[in-house]
Amino acid sequence: MKIAFFNPQGNFDKKDSHLTEHPDFGGQLIYVKELAKAMGKMGNKVDIITRKIIDKKWPEFSGDFDYYPDAENVRIVRIAFGGDKFLNKERLWDFLGEYVKNIYRFYQKEGFPDFVTTHYGDGGIAGAMFKKLTHIPYSFTAHSLGAQKKDKFKNAKDAEERYRFSIRISAEKVAMKYASFIVTSTQQEKEEQYSHNEYIDVYPEIKDKIFVIPPGVNTNIFYPDDTDEYKFSKLPIIVSSRLDPKKNIEFVIESFNKYLKDGFELIIVLRKKPEEYTGYERQLIEKAKKAKGKFLVITSQKELAKLYNSAAKHRGIFALTSHYEPFGLAIIEAMACKLPVISTRNGGPVEILDNGKYGHLVSTHEEFKEAALKIKDNYEKLSEESYKRVMEKYTWERCAKEYLNLIEKENVILPEFFEKQMG
């Protein structure tokens, strides 16, 4: 089967350039890449359709095609639209018609895909436009929905000017309506986000085609091994989120500073040297410095996995305390290395940790302290149970199989003997 992934924002290349360094290069890109690779390993031909960028600040994304060395069936296809320069996702809405028309022209030359998976509202509306042109069915995976983000802003006018919520939400509703099926990562996302008042006019007709398919973890990178390359003076608390207000790293710094400095050390992972950051990010770094936090510059997932394994050897903890976390891919990456987790009560982590069975959910500094001490006293048991949880429920192979089962219901799958006759 030939499957196209529509992901206009951010970009992809074999080096994972800029991954986690920019809001448009976050967990969604990891999701798309890993799901595409898992489908490719099952014999499907997969195209990730993104944007061609000719910009000195983003030199990695100027080629028409790119490939992953470990995924022979996966191709990155960059389509020109919206000019040459890099554009944040909020500015792409004006050019999605051009994106779709150029995808159509591209596939006219080499044959169209059997199915399209679309990602975020921009990919979703592109899938709907593409379906109108070709009648090729698509699925919609929002990753996050505009209504929930809109609710967090007090000044509606400023929020609309910056994030263009009216356009985003209208695109999401069309994507939902015409999708063959909709994928969410958690039950909470299915039940609460899609039933929001902004979507109430389409929810009754889409609710039965929403399926919960948890994402996976790359077990070729994140797995327990004997790595112990990092040394710690005390029990490490690891934070590896983007330095973004949404990730609420201040909460971890404050909890550590108030209660845990004697027995633990705080390690914050950065993508570049501390002095190279500015604005809010620099303020956060200075706050961590005052609390005696330490910093490690890590620029690859493989190196991050080494850190997690070393931290687990030293009875460490992984912390992710976002104000809201749609899923929590970083959590399962840590758990796959047997590194126990303290996380936010808001969003996907509640389901990953099964309401606290496989890790600790917190909302106050006191709860963070208690969680850290409980992990310390029950380390081996929680470490093993965390790992088993990931292996049983959160692999990309399982995620891909569930997608493909739904895709096959939308397509005529012929035996190879007859498929060849169709040319």
From Swiss-Prot:
The entry's keywords: Glycosyltransferase, Transferase
Transferase found in the keyword field: yes
Reaction catalysis annotation: beta-D-fructose 6-phosphate + UDP-alpha-D-glucose = sucrose 6(F)-phosphate + UDP + H(+)
Superkingdom to which the source organism belongs: Bacteria
Listed EC numbers: 2.4.1.14
InterPro entries in the record: Glyco_trans_1, SPS, Sucrose_synth_GT-B1
Protein's UniProt name: Probable sucrose-phosphate synthase
Species annotation: Thermosipho melanesiensis (strain DSM 12029 / CIP 104789 / BI429)
